[in-house]
């Protein structure tokens, strides 16, 4: 079954796919970052019965505009956010492999994961401000 056929049988049937290179499809869906940019989500067959959802490094690139992962603690927070959703970080790309019949739920879970990762800098500001008052 192709990725397009799998999407047709889910609530995501209104989503569109654009093939970016052979076997790699960009998901065109109404899923947006806080600034209005569309979340970059790519779908690839991982096996006959599973699909890889990934971002090809776009989430960490967005995060790097405002926030540096320059300490072991920040790296651990990032890794914890990703692993708590059952995903992995592969060469800068956040990846989640889901069974074909769980694609829609996987896309929704993945979009929440990307939102959490991209909002790490907000977490950092809140931690700094709360520590500021603790040290007064």
List each language-model region with its residue ranges.
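Nuclease-adjacent, charged terminal/linker segments that flank catalytic cores
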Residues: 1-108
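Solvent-exposed, charged helical/coil patches
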Residues: 93-136
């Amino acid at each position: 079954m192709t990725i397009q056929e799998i999407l047709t049988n889910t609530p995501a049937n209104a989503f569109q796919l654009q093939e970016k290179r052979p076997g790699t499809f960009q998901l065109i869906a109404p899923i947006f970052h806080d600034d209005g940019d569309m979340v970059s989500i790519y779908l690839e067959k991982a096996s006959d019965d599973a699909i890889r959802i990934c971002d090809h490094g776009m989430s960490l690139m967005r995060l790097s505009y405002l926030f540096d992962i320059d300490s072991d603690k920040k790296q651990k927070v990032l890794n914890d956010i990703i692993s708590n959703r059952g995903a992995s970080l592969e060469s800068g790309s956040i990846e989640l492999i889901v069974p074909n019949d769980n694609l829609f739920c996987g896309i929704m879970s993945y979009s929440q994961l990307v939102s959490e990762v991209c909002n790490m800098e907000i977490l950092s500001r809140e931690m700094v401000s709360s520590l500021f008052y603790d040290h007064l």
